[in-house]
Amino acid sequence: MISSLWIAKTGLDAQQTNMDVIANNLANVSTNGFKRQRAVFEDLLYQTIRQPGAQSSEQTTLPSGLQIGTGVRPVATERLHSQGNLSQTNNSKDVAIKGQGFFQVMLPDGSSAYTRDGSFQVDQNGQLVTAGGFQVQPAITIPANALSITIGRDGVVSVTQQGQAAPVQVGQLNLTTFMNDTGLESIGENLYTETQSSGAPNESTPGLNGAGLLYQGYVETSNVNVAEELVNMIQVQRAYEINSKAVSTTDQMLQKLTQL
């Protein structure tokens, strides 16, 4: 009888985790390049009273056995790297990725991180950086006298300078792809880092080796579907209520037992 309380409790914990994931998705509905998550669950160990296939007599075996479950637990929060919409900004330093790949940036400790947020800016040294100040890799320096910046679909960065008719190439924006995008670790600030599960980074020119293309003057918006998340929220709410009902029903049954 008591076990049902703990089983229902695992259900409540699982739905709370599910709700946390949905809330985070909705909170980041306006975050550039954000990829929504979904909670993945698995059942816990079973109490086996009769083994499936065990002998019930000399001539017969149990077709299904008797196993009592002990609940559920969250096993993963899978990040879904589907394409977000491209929103036009008309800012020459904004770049959106259409397809696979990430921009590579350098962290303060010299290690690499990866992002889909292409709302770039220029720092005091003319270096192309993210909105958080992380330098884009390979480093790209925009001259102080640049009149305009052009970023091609293939990542070639060129500028027009005063007194020069022809544009001058100042750098190359490459894209990094991974065998398993879901295996990347989210570290906040729209950044991911490589893990053993993601596989090694593969740097490519946009449009080659499976990498996407770049669109200047656009940013990729979040791939969160608000309507879908609200439907998921209703389902979670109902599941939470059902598990709460299981707790209260078990409590009522225990009260009846104590009255005997």
Swiss-Prot record:
Protein's cellular compartments: Bacterial flagellum basal body
Keywords in alphabetical order: Bacterial flagellum
GO CC annotations, alphabetized: bacterial-type flagellum; bacterial-type flagellum basal body, distal rod; bacterial-type flagellum basal body, rod; cell outer membrane
UniProt keyword Nuclease present: no
Gene Ontology BP term (one): bacterial-type flagellum-dependent cell motility
A Pfam short name: Flg_bbr_C
Principal cellular location given in the protein's record: other
Disulfide bonds: none
NCBIfam families: FlgEFG_subfam, flgG_G_neg
Description of how the protein assembles with itself and partners: The basal body constitutes a major portion of the flagellar organelle and consists of four rings (L,P,S, and M) mounted on a central rod. The rod consists of about 26 subunits of FlgG in the distal portion, and FlgB, FlgC and FlgF are thought to build up the proximal portion of the rod with about 6 subunits each.
Family: Belongs to the flagella basal body rod proteins family.
Protein name, entry field: Flagellar basal-body rod protein FlgG
Source organism per UniProt: Escherichia coli (strain K12)
Lineage, uppermost ranks: Bacteria, Pseudomonadati, Pseudomonadota, Gammaproteobacteria, Enterobacterales
Gene: flgG
